[in-house]
Amino acid sequence: MNSIEFPLLDRTTQNSVISTTSNDLSNWSRLSSLWPLLYGTSCCFIEFASLIGSRFDFDRYGLVPRSSPRQADLILTAGTVTMKMAPSLVRLYEQMPEPKYVIAMGACTITGGMFSTDSYSTVRGVDKLIPVDVYLPGCPPKPEAVIDAITKLRKKVSREIYEDRIGSQQENRYFTTNHKFHVGRSTHTGNYDQGLLYKSPSTSEIPPETETFFKYKSSVSSHELVN
């Protein structure tokens, strides 16, 4: 047991009785039982999949991948997150029991990556949706970098006080509702799906600068184009 991470556990009496605090004991028990929920959407997740093999053997950290958010205390997001996927990601995070942690893996998850400049449907950073504990940059990050991120998360857990974490999350609320677009001009060339275009019945020609507008409804599965 590391006496640097748990200094109170190093205090023993002549009868070999260990004195510690409930927070240190709880943190120590959670260090070897981080059960991740793998949320991979693109190529970054392929690098994480290599950790399952014998070369890296992430089982030594107590990582047991779960398929249900109710059994996980760590969600690892890898890849691009779109506006349509955002409500599902937030729902998965909210279904995880406390305490829960997030590792953002890859440039696309952290900032939107190469899609951040010209994509209208990409979330520019998963931290706009859920709180992130460890950022793991790279395109894609190497498996060694993933292990380093897990090590840093374990150090954070070892020094954590549960009450302080809950209080911080209650004060700093994150975006937990569906994305909604405001009415705006068509992007770039304006070559939308012809079935979605709406033409005014009063005029046959529409000026280029006001050709099409789009409005994102509360439902994430449909778009409506209006004047």
Curated annotation (Swiss-Prot):
<dbReference type="GO" id="GO:0051539">
    <property type="term" value="F:4 iron, 4 sulfur cluster binding"/>
</dbReference>
<dbReference type="GO" id="GO:0008137">
    <property type="term" value="F:NADH dehydrogenase (ubiquinone) activity"/>
</dbReference>
<dbReference type="GO" id="GO:0015990">
    <property type="term" value="P:electron transport coupled proton transport"/>
</dbReference>
<dbReference type="GO" id="GO:0045271">
    <property type="term" value="C:respiratory chain complex I"/>
</dbReference>
<feature type="binding site">
    <location>
        <position position="108"/>
    </location>
    <ligand>
        <name>[4Fe-4S] cluster</name>
    </ligand>
</feature>
<dbReference type="GO" id="GO:0009060">
    <property type="term" value="P:aerobic respiration"/>
</dbReference>
<keyword id="KW-0521">NADP</keyword>
<keyword id="KW-0411">Iron-sulfur</keyword>
<keyword id="KW-0150">Chloroplast</keyword>
<dbReference type="Pfam" id="PF01058">
    <property type="entry name" value="Oxidored_q6"/>
</dbReference>
<keyword id="KW-0793">Thylakoid</keyword>
<dbReference type="GO" id="GO:0009535">
    <property type="term" value="C:chloroplast thylakoid membrane"/>
</dbReference>
<comment type="similarity">
    <text>Belongs to the complex I 20 kDa subunit family.</text>
</comment>
<keyword id="KW-0479">Metal-binding</keyword>
<dbReference type="GO" id="GO:0005506">
    <property type="term" value="F:iron ion binding"/>
</dbReference>
<dbReference type="InterPro" id="IPR006137">
    <property type="entry name" value="NADH_UbQ_OxRdtase-like_20kDa"/>
</dbReference>
<feature type="binding site">
    <location>
        <position position="43"/>
    </location>
    <ligand>
        <name>[4Fe-4S] cluster</name>
    </ligand>
</feature>
<keyword id="KW-1278">Translocase</keyword>
<keyword id="KW-0472">Membrane</keyword>
<comment type="function">
    <text>NDH shuttles electrons from NAD(P)H:plastoquinone, via FMN and iron-sulfur (Fe-S) centers, to quinones in the photosynthetic chain and possibly in a chloroplast respiratory chain. The immediate electron acceptor for the enzyme in this species is believed to be plastoquinone. Couples the redox reaction to proton translocation, and thus conserves the redox energy in a proton gradient.</text>
</comment>
<dbReference type="GO" id="GO:0048038">
    <property type="term" value="F:quinone binding"/>
</dbReference>
<comment type="subunit">
    <text>NDH is composed of at least 16 different subunits, 5 of which are encoded in the nucleus.</text>
</comment>
<keyword id="KW-0934">Plastid</keyword>
<protein>
    <recommendedName>
        <fullName>NAD(P)H-quinone oxidoreductase subunit K, chloroplastic</fullName>
        <ecNumber>7.1.1.-</ecNumber>
    </recommendedName>
</protein>
<keyword id="KW-0408">Iron</keyword>
<feature type="binding site">
    <location>
        <position position="44"/>
    </location>
    <ligand>
        <name>[4Fe-4S] cluster</name>
    </ligand>
</feature>
<keyword id="KW-0520">NAD</keyword>
<dbReference type="InterPro" id="IPR006138">
    <property type="entry name" value="NADH_UQ_OxRdtase_20Kd_su"/>
</dbReference>
<keyword id="KW-0813">Transport</keyword>
<feature type="binding site">
    <location>
        <position position="139"/>
    </location>
    <ligand>
        <name>[4Fe-4S] cluster</name>
    </ligand>
</feature>
<keyword id="KW-0004">4Fe-4S</keyword>
<keyword id="KW-0618">Plastoquinone</keyword>
<keyword id="KW-0874">Quinone</keyword>
<dbReference type="GO" id="GO:0019684">
    <property type="term" value="P:photosynthesis, light reaction"/>
</dbReference>
